[in-house]
């Protein structure tokens, strides 16, 4: 069983170290991660500047690129083999609801998914790495349950299935207080907080993106609700952004626009 690990917090982050330590006992694990923090980089790829692969003292390889860059380079030229699973995280903070659109953690996992490999993005719901070892153990528990079916596909004993992509958020709780796992949908957030404006020493205005908005749609069945109840939320994702419900309306609108005069 071969697993590729990436993240968006950088190769030295506590989350990726804890995840590696938890998974190396159940699989062959390779780490390829960004050199620096690349939060909120989504699926961005670096197209106009060169990237370099370096190896840290602990064997982790790191790249001066985005999370998606790291997975892309690993899968298309660095590893020399096809992993059975791509795992991203553990992120320093939640990736729930609208966060998934911006998240570099999700973006790294999605890059693996786009290459036809099952993938999971793991995040811890609060920043600061408190109880990160507990979060890593929860990630290990989930992956351990998936290994038999992944190995069966890899060995040809089970028919291959389309790749899947999971977004997993782990509550920041001590051992024994995590209630279990719950499959749920994405919630929604309110719009982000206002931009923060400061003045530089030269008198110029500087702008900082404000924090994520609070939960807006967080009722039962959402990832927000599950994690506040002490559960690890599991949300299956896909990349089809088509608004299927409104397709007929826009088809009618387009027909009116394109009829011959």
UniProtKB/Swiss-Prot annotation:
Domain of life: Bacteria
UniProt-listed SUPFAM superfamilies: SurE-like
EC number: 3.1.3.5
Cofactor(s), names only, from the UniProt record: a divalent metal cation
Subcellular location per the Swiss-Prot or TrEMBL entry: Cytoplasm
Catalytic activity: a ribonucleoside 5'-phosphate + H2O = a ribonucleoside + phosphate
Broad EC category: hydrolase
Cofactor note (record): Binds 1 divalent metal cation per subunit.
Family annotation (Gene3D superfamilies): Survival protein SurE-like phosphatase/nucleotidase
Sequence positions that bind a divalent metal cation: 8-9, 39, 91
Pfam families, A to Z: SurE (PF01975)
One cellular component (GO) term of this entry: cytoplasm
Cytoplasm as UniProt keyword: yes
Keywords on record: Cytoplasm, Hydrolase, Metal-binding, Nucleotide-binding
Gene Ontology molecular-function annotations: 3'-nucleotidase activity; 5'-nucleotidase activity; exopolyphosphatase activity; metal ion binding; nucleotide binding
InterPro entries per the UniProt record, alphabetical: SurE (IPR030048), SurE-like_Pase/nucleotidase (IPR002828), SurE-like_sf (IPR036523)
Family: Belongs to the SurE nucleotidase family.
HAMAP family registered for this protein in UniProt: SurE (MF_00060)
General function of this protein: Nucleotidase that shows phosphatase activity on nucleoside 5'-monophosphates.
Designated name of the protein: 5'-nucleotidase SurE
